[in-house]
Amino acid sequence: MQVSIACTEHNLKSRNGEDRLLSKQSSTAPNVVNAARAKFRTVAIIARSLGTFTPQHHISLKESTAKQTGMKYRNLGKSGLRVSCLGLGTWVTFGGQISDEVAERLMTIAYESGVNLFDTAEVYAAGKAEVILGSIIKKKGWRRSSLVITTKLYWGGKAETERGLSRKHIIEGLKGSLQRLQLEYVDVVFANRPDSNTPMEEIVRAMTHVINQGMAMYWGTSRWSAMEIMEAYSVARQFNMIPPVCEQAEYHLFQREKVEVQLPELYHKIGVGAMTWSPLACGIISGKYGNGVPESSRASLKCYQWLKERIVSEEGRKQQNKLKDLSPIAERLGCTLPQLAVAWCLRNEGVSSVLLGSSTPEQLIENLGAIQVLPKMTSHVVNEIDNILRNKPYSKKDYRS
């Protein structure tokens, strides 16, 4: 657009010369000359009008803020899809830790706060999370066009053909998800992990097929390496198919390298954005584990023994000490430690959206408050945090320089 305007402005400057040329030709082709002049004037008028609003439009494409809720919206990668910078995830909670009534309350709070992104997966609570999410959307009567619904495929069932990223499971798995969600399509379908048993061309062809069939608008990856994402993009370009637009990756104060080093390079090269999850590191950054593992916490559950071991390990104790050192920064900014952690994730402009996981309305409201903390995340504050964490990743280019 900028190039077109620049060329048009150049044409406007040389308009007198063109008029003289047209006047010389007018004796032989008056109709052609008049048509050319009319077309030129139309282009000039359009160029002037575009010149007045293009800069503002360019800014809004990067980030915009809803006046009523204060929610910020960003593009998902280099696609045109606008997503709220905070989304609501359903892992563990929907169909598991919380009741259907609490799930409805959480979705209502999120929606009324400006959240338009809701993420789920076929494997969450064995499909029940999708059922609950779809039922709430239908009950609330929210306009489908106002929502961005994403789901993930890989673990669909116990049968050998009900998992993986074969063409069969991608198509059948997405059909099953749509039935549970009671939706005609999802906005983004994610490959929930890489599949070494399926050729990349088959995966990309299947994702392109479900998009062409109207079952999804875009497709993305989750837990894929940069090399695997690049391979998918190359295959898509080679065979004129649709490449992925986004990678779902874990990102928090103690997990940084992929989102801060690998994905930015992919974004600039092929336009793949980042949708991140677990901003509180499965609750480790919430502050509840500073004095051990409470009985009512997620880490106390039998199926989360790995989380408990992680917390009580030597590395876990070091992380808790670092969180204590971060608390004064949060107090100075007038926020809680979880709000600081979420705002820290949002300060990364390469992150399109951060998925929140909450089991109570109070937790969700607190985490949504990170939007108000984001303007306070100055370079000085970020440097303070880096000095405490001492885990800032660097690319090979940085080391060479």
Curated annotation (Swiss-Prot):
Q: So which tissues is this one expressed in?
A: Detected in brain. Detected in hippocampus, in the middle third of the molecular layer of the dentate gyrus and in the mossy fiber zone of the CA3 region. Detected in globus pallidus and pars reticulata of the substantia nigra (at protein level). Specifically expressed in the nervous system. Detected in mesenteric arteries.
For this protein, the record's Gene3D superfamilies field holds: NADP-dependent oxidoreductase domain (3.20.20.100)
GO MF annotations in UniProt: aldo-keto reductase (NADPH) activity; carbonyl reductase (NADPH) activity; molecular function inhibitor activity; NADPH binding; potassium channel regulator activity; protein domain specific binding; transmembrane transporter binding; voltage-gated potassium channel activity
Question: What are the catalytic residues?
Answer: 124
Q: Which reaction does it catalyse?
A: a primary alcohol + NADP(+) = an aldehyde + NADPH + H(+); a secondary alcohol + NADP(+) = a ketone + NADPH + H(+)
EC number in record: 1.1.1.-
* Signal peptide location: none
Topology in the membrane?
Peripheral membrane protein
What InterPro entries does the entry give?
K_chnl_volt-dep_bsu_KCNAB, K_chnl_volt-dep_bsu_KCNAB-rel, K_chnl_volt-dep_bsu_KCNAB1, NADP_OxRdtase_dom, NADP_OxRdtase_dom_sf
Keywords recorded for this protein, A-Z:
Cell membrane, Cytoplasm, Ion transport, Membrane, NADP, Oxidoreductase, Potassium, Potassium transport, Transport
Q: What enzyme category does the UniProt record give?
A: oxidoreductase
Membership in a protein family: Belongs to the shaker potassium channel beta subunit family.
Name of protein: Voltage-gated potassium channel subunit beta-1
Source organism per entry reads Rattus norvegicus
